[in-house]
Amino acid sequence: MEIILKQDFKGLGYKNEIVKVKPGYARNYLIPQGFALVANETNKKIAQENAKQMAHKMAKRKQDAESIANRLSQLAIKIKAKVGEKGKIFGAITPIQIADALKEQTGYIADRRDISFEKPIKTLGTHKAIIKLHKEVVLTLSFEVIAEE
């Protein structure tokens, strides 16, 4: 049975995609729960139109993410941390601290879940963070950890 998904469904497909599933799965679970529609001609046309609009929105979001990446890559972000002897930080720099520094110094609001590090940051100096701005746009941001006075 062919159905049109109303939202992304892990292991099955993406929103507005036409997929084939077993009739019982469609009738007893996907359609009653509101996850899918029967793929008749009318619904197929609506899904195609929605897919075109969604593709246009995604292209715009990608373009916006690229412009943000260009702007952020040119900035020098500084993060203050409490330091012990030998220049070692108490604890480690976290994605939340990076997100807060970005918001404070640039005005860009980043989700902490989109920020990652290659390895834990426990020393002073220049380091890199990987920020996922979009599915296809990933920024490697250089930042400096300085001692808090």
Swiss-Prot record:
Superkingdom: Bacteria
A Pfam match: Ribosomal_L9_C
Key words of the record: Ribonucleoprotein, Ribosomal protein, RNA-binding, rRNA-binding
InterPro entries, sorted: Ribosomal_bL9, Ribosomal_bL9/RNase_H1_N, Ribosomal_bL9_bac/chp, Ribosomal_bL9_C, Ribosomal_bL9_C_sf, Ribosomal_bL9_N, Ribosomal_bL9_N_sf
Gene Ontology BP annotations: translation
Coiled-coil blocks: none
GO cellular component: ribonucleoprotein complex; ribosome
Name the UniProt record assigns to this protein: Large ribosomal subunit protein bL9
Native source organism of the sequence: Amoebophilus asiaticus (strain 5a2)
Origin organism lineage: Bacteria, Pseudomonadati, Bacteroidota, Cytophagia, Cytophagales
